[in-house]
Amino acid sequence: MELLVDIFGYLSIILHGITIVAQSMTLGGILFLVFLVRPFMHLLPQGAELERRIAKLTIWSAIGLILAEVAGVGLQVAVVKSTVDLSFLDVMQAPFAIAGTIKILCALLLIPCLSQRMSTGLVGAALPLLIGAAELTAATFTTHAFARLDNNVLLLFVEGLHQFGAAIWIGAIPCFVLALSKLHDANAWRIVGARFSRMSMIGVASIIISGSVMCVYYIGDIPGFYGTAYGVMVGAKIAMFLALLLLGLGNLMVTERLRKNQDTSVIRLRRFAEVEIGIGFTIFFAAASLTSVPPAVDLTADRVTLHEIAVRNAPAWPRLTSPDHDQLAISEMQAQLDKDAGLRHQAAGQAIVPGSGVLPPRNADDIAWSEYNHHWAGIFVMVIGLLALLNRAGVGWLKHWPLLFLLMAGFLLVRSDPEVWPMGQEGFWVAWRDVEVAQHRFFVALIILFGVFEWAVRTGRLRSPKAALVFPLLVSVGGAMLLTHSHQISNVKDQLLIELTHTPLALAGVASGWARWLELRLPGRGGRIAGWVWPCCFMLVGVILLWYREA
């Protein structure tokens, strides 16, 4: 069990992200039902059916929340029990376990409350809201605010306001998309669009106010933004939040046109809302990643300066030649262990045990090896983006460009982790205990999947419109997961300088995925523009990778 603590730590971030998504959808569904569907149900031609569908979606979100919380709390309990000599009952008295248990109970209570038998009357409205408020309160006790010694009450309230804003806006968008798809009347679209716009404005205001307060108390100053991992991740959240505001503004304009002209198409409203869901959920995973790092105000030492950022990112020619595998630090350490064991006529031990928590040694050749990998990956992505642009421009025979993803995946599988099979001594399966190896393999699997699907779609082997959506979805997932990617480097500054490169990579990946989604789903000029945007985002990813430095 001790050898799995690192991988469990990473899985806990992923589970926390899923928990935030499920919680926001659950609370958003309650608010959408209580403040939009039920008050206007008599004005909507399919009001009763819409209420049933929204309630069903909210119930499934609550079930997802239960499963995510059970898995998350169970994982944390297992890790604590394996590292500290405490009984199960003792661990379950910890604040995270109590808060998780309350959230599970609240989600369980919501399921019968959202059934049709309890959907009418004052009780049908008040009870889900009260249970949702209890759920939200418990959720705030798993945030940084609970651990603060100063301004604890204020920050707990602010955290609650922040999560409320995310729920009433982002968490309710799936309900909004469902409503638009089930309603077929222009007047109904106008009512739902106008009401949800007001709900979204409340959410935006809540997020801006609470986010501003948290920036003051958790980041403190401008150097905290660019000089700490917490500040960099908050910056990524702000960038995606601004993208959501632009999409929301576009939808508000459609809603206003719909109010003046009932013949206005709502297709853009639906497609932009779909992208808002994707970017919003990515923000939730960034928020989950924030829980694994201390607030910037607590990290006064080892901050990265602007000078260090400028030096690290100074222009330099890409590294196109690789050092020998035998020159890497782990290879040299293993060779020395083998030599010493041979002199003693004993079996040699492993230089590094996967999952042991011991950070691997690094030397200049390790840095060169990593830079070589990133730079050649950048060349792959640059070429892919260029070929996709040329194919978009009408060069039909370039439709096979997605096959380059398979070459890139093979390159990364072999080179990303030199201490692991096939180049190193660590076995293929045992290396899964290493969190960085597991993340690299996950990305390789994603690259293979979206490469195969996109090639099959472009060559006509897969003709289903749903198959075409696999590529943008997986690209977006890859970008979101890159926000949670970690490196096993002991030097805090070096780790942050690497993260400063990976964060824009993630944002460009998310942008490219959802731009491709719009190309496929949005008819007319908007879709055509998106078709040119996403290959450019790929080329931007390539440029960033070619710019990558570790020293």
Task: Show where each model-derived region lies.
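Polytopic transmembrane helical bundles with strong interfacial aromatic enrichment
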Residues: 1-368, 390-401, 451, 455-460, ...
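Helix-loop junctions on the outward
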Residues: 71-87, 414-435
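Structural signature of hydrophobic alpha-helical transmembrane segments
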Residues: 96-104, 128, 372-379, 439-445, ...
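Alpha-helical transmembrane segments and their helix-helix packing motifs
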Residues: 112, 407-420, 432, 460, ...
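Membrane-helix interface and helix-disruption motif detector
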Residues: 225-227, 367-371, 393-398, 423-442, ...
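Short, solvent-exposed interaction modules
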Residues: 427-456, 505-514, 518
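A motif-centric signal for short, conserved binding hotspots located
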Residues: 475-486, 509-515
